[in-house]
UniProtKB/Swiss-Prot annotation:
Protein family (similarity comment): Belongs to the RecF family.
GO cellular component terms given for this protein: cytoplasm
Role according to the record: The RecF protein is involved in DNA metabolism; it is required for DNA replication and normal SOS inducibility. RecF binds preferentially to single-stranded, linear DNA. It also seems to bind ATP.
Keywords recorded for this protein, A-Z: ATP-binding, Cytoplasm, DNA damage, DNA repair, DNA replication, DNA-binding, Nucleotide-binding, SOS response
Record keyword Nucleotide-binding present: yes
PANTHER family linked to this entry: DNA REPLICATION AND REPAIR PROTEIN RECF
Name of the coding gene: recF
Binding-site residues, ATP: G30, E31, N32, A33, Q34, G35, K36, T37
TM stretches of this protein: none
One GO BP annotation of this record: double-strand break repair
Domain of life the protein comes from: Bacteria
The name this protein goes by in its record: DNA replication and repair protein RecF
Length: 370
């Protein structure tokens, strides 16, 4: 999977710009606040129909403009395909092959990306919410079924929380509606939990040998999925559903008193253990960086296995955060197989030989100077 061209109109600090992309490595050089990260963000946004930096799409529109447009031509095993995202202050529109997609679940997955930025260290040391978002973003790119199940779960969760709040405030008395919502809630909670558990298992199988290679077999990495709803995965679907319903039924009064759902995938977490110790609590900064790097490289391999093509890798000012050995391991792993976009303030310290003669672009005040 390669991005041949990227065209932006009124995106962030860009007026109109076209980037003809190198199939291997593209290095975007420039001082801070010139637009390097905006370019990477536009590729991410084109892939996932949302930015990783803001939840407000209006911020993506250039100052004093009415709209923003991102368009990319994608090469993949079946040929080429244009993807378009049009953003206005009222909403957004996405197209595949010039055909509008009515649902984002139909759109996401055509262009797969893996982003690695300094803030991705928060996957290890940050809050559970960050790790849940990590699962949803990566798993959502390779499974439209998961995206749909997650959307249904979030819809029912919102309805259930609204009803619990009304019960707490005494605006509602009837628990029958809560029981109905719990039934629907349990069904999609089980589906989301099942898919997350499988994803973490697959990711761990790929991350373990990568981590061992980076540390010269001195450290062993393990990933542990910590679901809020704990049930026996070996049971059949009906038995698992019954087990979840039992948990929800036993805690119905607690949830009513609190006015919020206390159990479900929205409260899941993951732990990353290095040599049997929780990396979030006990890991050094170096161990946390190695863990994050191992996870990102495992994501790349997992997407290739599931989709049949390597994703595009976005490295946002991250090489400066890695020491020489980690940087070399990253670059040697991706060379010749993963199209990569790198932002940096300087090419000093980047091994050009390993990066296979990259194409350099200088970014200055929203303009690309080759």
């Amino acid at each position: 999977m390669k991005l041949n061209t990227l065209q932006l109109e009124n995106y962030r600090n860009y007026d109109e710009v076209t980037l003809k992309c190198h199939p291997d490595v593209n290095i975007l050089i420039g001082e801070n606040a010139q637009g390097k990260t905006n370019l990477l963000e536009s590729i991410y946004t084109l892939a996932l129909a949302k930015s990783h930096r803001t939840s407000n799409d209006k911020e993506l529109i250039r100052f004093n403009a009415d709209y923003a447009k991102i368009e990319g031509e994608l090469s993949y095993r079946h040929g080429t395909m244009p993807l378009t995202m049009f953003i206005t202050k009222k909403g957004k529109q996405v197209k595949v092959n010039h055909l509008e997609q009515s649902r984002l679940t139909q759109y996401i997955g055509h262009l797969n990306v893996v982003l690695f930025a300094p803030e991705d260290l928060n996957i290890v040391k940050g809050s559970p919410q960050i790790r849940r978002r990590f699962i949803d973003m990566e798993l959502g790119q390779i499974s439209a079924v998961y995206l749909n199940d997650l959307a249904q779960y979030q819809r029912i969760l919102k309805q259930k929380n609204n009803y619990l709040k009304q019960l707490q405030l005494g605006q509602k008395k009837d628990l029958t509606m809560l029981e109905v919502l719990n039934q629907q809630f349990a069904e999609y909670a089980m589906k989301v939990t099942d898919k997350r558990a499988h994803f973490i298992q697959e990711l761990e199988s790929l991350a373990k040998p990568i981590h061992a290679g980076i540390t010269n077999d001195k450290e062993a990495l393990s990933l542990n999925y910590l679901p809020s709803l704990k049930f026996d995965y070996a049971q059949n679907e009906a038995a698992r559903l019954e087990e979840i319903m039992s948990i929800l039924s036993d805690n119905m009064q607690r949830e009513k008193e609190r006015g919020i759902s206390l159990f479900g995938p929205h409260r899941d977490d993951i732990s990353f253990d290095v040599n049997g110790m929780d990396a979030q609590t006990y890991g050094s900064q170096g161990q946390q960086r190695t863990t994050a790097l191992s996870i990102k490289l495992a994501e790349i391999e997992l997407m290739n296995i599931e989709v049949g093509e390597y994703p595009i890798l976005l490295l946002d000012d991250v090489l400066s955060e890695l020491d020489d050995s980690r940087q070399t391991h990253l670059l040697s792993t991706i060379q010749h197989k993963v199209q990569t976009f790198v932002t940096t303030t300087s090419v000093d310290g980047i091994d050009h030989e390993i990066m296979n003669n990259p194409k350099l672009y200088r970014i200055n005040q929203g303009e690309i100077i080759k």
